[in-house]
Regions:
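Conserved "right-hand" nucleotidyltransferase catalytic core of DNA-directed polymerases
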Residues: 1-193, 202, 206-208, 215-218, ...
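Catalytic phosphate/metal-binding cores of nucleic-acid and nucleotide-processing enzymes, i.e., regions
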Residues: 22, 35-42, 358, 378, ...
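Metal-dependent catalytic core segments for phosphate chemistry
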Residues: 218-254, 332-355
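Short hydrophobic/aromatic beta-strand micro-patches
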Residues: 281, 400-404
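Helix N-cap motif at beta-to-alpha junctions
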Residues: 286, 404-408
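A common structural junction motif
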Residues: 299-300, 414-424
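Conserved short beta-strand edge segments in small beta-sheet-based binding/regulatory domains
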Residues: 421-433
Length: 447
């Protein structure tokens, strides 16, 4: 008899809620709790509906990719008499040895190592052929076979969206992760493979595929918070921030440096990257790097100002609060004067003595901006659902949605743009097409 057991479940849940409700009020996280709770029904609907896929085309593309891979492997065999196992470094090394080509080795084991970056940057035909064959193999096995054909049910793929769980800190910032399959991993950057795989995802019947992307979402939030905290130079950046403004170009113009340098520094600082690592990434000398950094911080002081303000708040209060009230906490401690393994306070004191400080507060600005971006995207999804519009997928600052016409497309843009108010113009870019991989500016498409 399970009646009493079921009653206990209900009673314990109710009593637990009475305690947690009080805790939510004490912590002043009611608004974000309401958002996350309301979002559950949206995510259930998204998973239940799934995303339509073109199965016939998926199988056809899979065969085409297999033919391209086989052709490259056949060429390699004709050149050197060996057909390598593409993902086995020892096997690839045999072909390189036959070709008389040197290759990198891993520092610890001194084993052959063939990264994509190294293969693609080589000017010899063999590494380029290996890189291409690997690309075709991965596109077929990872994205067509495993992501689509192994997961489709009645022509649809039903991925799981996790609003507060991720291998990369979803519980810290509130960003979504996805699994079974991970539709956030559908390739985008590769001009050949990206559009090919994305073209297999198609809209609902009698609809168009819409890709709605927040334009420079995190940089806009950076300027917003710099204004709120009255950072020096923030007003100048805000005044330059029109609808079509490019944050990295604004900073480049302010600092009198190239856009590439500005972008690398902007992103590096927002992620809490140290100066030495940034200098290595820019590929410049230490002396050149110091001059560049001095110039950057002198002319664009609001970035460092906001970073320091966030780190101080995280250290003093133990948390940073995002735009809709999410608390990103800093509950681990490390030694005051050097870096070591961080622990909860009592264990840290037991291990290192009383001279401890909160760990990871240098990441406070990143958590504020990423967390606020997650808040904005989630609020947009909820507001759209309230308008009867349900997203197919969410990929960081992008929502993919089936739209009936130009009017509905512009409704999505308006809802996403206005769901959270910030102190600089917000912008949503929209591209429309007959599939995810065949999209263009919506104004051109609906001409």
């Amino acid at each position: 008899y399970v009646g009493m057991y079921g009653e206990q479940d209900a009673d314990l849940t109710y009593r637990l809620w009475q305690t947690l409700k009080q805790k939510i009020n004490e912590e002043e996280v009611g608004e974000i709790y309401k958002l996350e709770s309301s979002l559950i029904r949206v995510l259930i609907e998204m998973r239940r509906r799934g995303v339509r896929v073109d199965l016939d085309r998926a199988e056809q593309v899979g065969k085409e990719l297999k033919n391209k891979e086989d052709k490259l492997l056949s060429q390699i065999k004709n050149w050197y008499g060996i057909t390598p196992d593409l993902w086995a470094a020892a096997s690839v090394a045999q072909v390189f040895d036959r070709a008389g080509l040197e290759y990198p080795r891993s520092p610890k084991l001194n084993a052959p190592s063939f990264t994509s970056a190294w293969l693609e940057s080589h000017d010899h035909k063999l590494p380029l052929a290996i890189a291409q064959a690997r690309k075709f193999n991965k596109a077929r096995t990872t994205f067509i076979d495993k992501m689509i054909l192994d997961h489709e049910v009645d022509g649809r793929v039903h991925g799981e969206l996790h609003p507060l769980r991720s291998d990369e800190g979803g519980t810290v910032t509130g960003r979504f992760s996805c699994s079974n399959p991970n539709l956030q991993q559908v390739p985008a950057r590769d001009p050949e493979i990206g559009s090919l795989i994305r073209s297999l995802f198609i809209p609902e019947e009698d609809c168009h595929w819409g890709c709605f992307d927040y334009s420079q979402q995190e940089p806009r939030l950076t300027v917003h918070y710099s204004l709120l905290t009255k950072q020096e130079g923030a007003q100048e950046a805000a005044e330059a921030y029109t609808d079509d403004a490019d944050f990295h170009q604004i900073v480049a113009d302010m600092a009198n440096i190239s856009r590439k340098e500005a972008k690398n520094i902007n992103l590096g600082l927002s992620y809490g990257m140290g100066k030495d690592k940034l200098i290595r990434q820019l590929g410049i000398s230490e002396e050149e790097g110091q001059i560049l950094f001095d110039q950057y911080h002198e002319r664009v002081p609001f970035i460092r100002g906001l970073r320091d303000t966030c780190a101080r708040l995280g250290s003093n209060r133990g948390f940073i609060k995002t735009i809709l009230g999410r608390k990103c906490r800093f509950n681990l401690y490390e030694p005051m004067s050097y870096r070591d393994t961080p622990y909860p306070y009592e264990k840290a004191v037991e291990t290192y003595g009383k001279g401890v400080k909160r760990a990871f507060t240098y990441k406070a600005m990143n958590r504020l901006i990423q967390g606020s971006a997650a808040d904005m995207t989630k609020k947009a999804m909820l507001d759209l659902h309230n308008e009867g519009i349900l997203a197919h997928t969410q990929v960081h600052d992008e929502l993919n949605i089936s739209v009936k016409d130009k009017q509905e497309c512009e409704k999505v843009i308006e809802v996403m743009r206005d769901c959270v108010k910030i102190n600089v113009p917000n912008k949503v870019d929209a591209e429309i097409g007959k599939s995810w991989g065949e999209i263009e500016n919506y104004k051109e498409y609906f001409k």
